[in-house]
From Swiss-Prot:
Pfam families: Ubie_methyltran (PF01209). InterPro entries: SAM-dependent_MTases_sf, UbiE/COQ5_MeTrFase, UbiE/COQ5_MeTrFase_CS. This is Ubiquinone/menaquinone biosynthesis C-methyltransferase UbiE. One of its GO terms (molecular function) is 2-methoxy-6-polyprenyl-1,4-benzoquinol methyltransferase activity. It catalyses: a 2-demethylmenaquinol + S-adenosyl-L-methionine = a menaquinol + S-adenosyl-L-homocysteine + H(+); a 2-methoxy-6-(all-trans-polyprenyl)benzene-1,4-diol + S-adenosyl-L-methionine = a 5-methoxy-2-methyl-3-(all-trans-polyprenyl)benzene-1,4-diol + S-adenosyl-L-homocysteine + H(+). It comes from the Bacteria. Keywords: Menaquinone biosynthesis, Methyltransferase, S-adenosyl-L-methionine, Transferase, Ubiquinone biosynthesis. S-adenosyl-L-methionine binds at T74, D95, N123, A124. Pathway: Quinol/quinone metabolism; menaquinone biosynthesis; menaquinol from 1,4-dihydroxy-2-naphthoate: step 2/2; Cofactor biosynthesis; ubiquinone biosynthesis. It comes from Shewanella loihica (strain ATCC BAA-1088 / PV-4). PANTHER family: 2-METHOXY-6-POLYPRENYL-1,4-BENZOQUINOL METHYLASE, MITOCHONDRIAL, METHYLTRANSFERASE.
Length: 251
């Protein structure tokens, strides 16, 4: 187990049994699924769209490719990839949470994103796909919620084709003291209040802030990817490192 002892891990700042974390995280996303997109726009001031756009551009997807949008939630990346890979390609939107998957499916179908998208409820630690199957895997704002991150990264490596690329978009560590102080104030004082007003669920957004602080920093995550077997691993900080995009290849 990559976090804590063999039978414990963290849920935000709390130490919990590893077997219980998935259920606790599931409760959070069952609670916020219906207003997930609204909260993303509000809490990031819309900047999450720029972070995701950069991820799409960095992926280098082309017509005919197979893409896995892991922890794909409400399908922002899936919608873009669906257009890029076209009728000869395939995008799989996978999420462990059925509430998020349902919201994503309804949203994309209402927008006419059909034909080359399929939906799979899946645990990132044990992906239910064949070896060497996908050209590209993205996981955006999902890895920090995974109990055994090392197992998940190894699972992603297994299902990537040789030459395939993994992109991990995740909250990370601000690079400057002033930004860290402002970010902490926003995350722990303002964000839960916004969550309470919009979703009537301050607790889920307290967990969000805590889970971000407990997530590995940029260099640690890079090392985890290298240890799993990824090559040419690098990362790009965005918004002073509040978010980082890690990229690695399977050869």
């Amino acid at each position: 187990m990559s976090e804590g002892s063999s039978n414990s891990t963290h849920f935000g700042y709390k130490t919990v049994d590893a077997e219980k974390k998935a259920d606790l995280v599931a409760d959070v996303f069952h609670s916020v699924a219906a207003k997930y997109d609204i909260m993303n726009d509000v809490m990031s001031f819309g900047i999450h769209r720029l972070w995701k756009r950069f991820t799409i551009e960095s992926a280098g997807a082309r017509p005919g490719m197979k893409v896995l949008d892991l922890a794909g939630g409400t399908g922002d990346l899936t919608a873009k990839f669906s257009h890029i890979v076209g009728n000869t390609g395939q995008v799989t939107l996978a999420d462990i949470n059925d509430s998020m998957l349902k919201v994503g499916r309804e949203k994309l179908r209402n927008r006419g994103v059909v034909g080359n998208v399929n939906y799979v409820q899946a645990n990132a630690e044990a992906l239910p796909f064949p070896d060497n199957h996908f050209d590209i895997i993205t996981i955006a704002f999902g890895l920090r919620n995974v109990t055994d991150k090392d197992a998940a990264i190894r699972s992603m490596l297994r299902v990537l084709k040789p030459g395939g690329k993994l992109l991990i978009l995740e909250f990370s560590k601000p690079q400057h003291d002033l930004m860290r102080k402002v970010y902490d104030l926003y995350s722990f004082k303002i964000l839960p209040k916004m969550g309470d007003i919009i979703t009537q669920d301050a607790g889920s957004y307290e967990y969000l802030a805590e889970s971000i602080r407990m997530h590995p920093d940029q260099e640690t995550l890079k090392g985890m990817m290298v240890d799993a077997g990824f090559e040419q691993v690098e990362y790009t900080n965005m918004t002073d490192g509040i978010v980082a995009l890690h990229k690695g290849y399977k050869f």
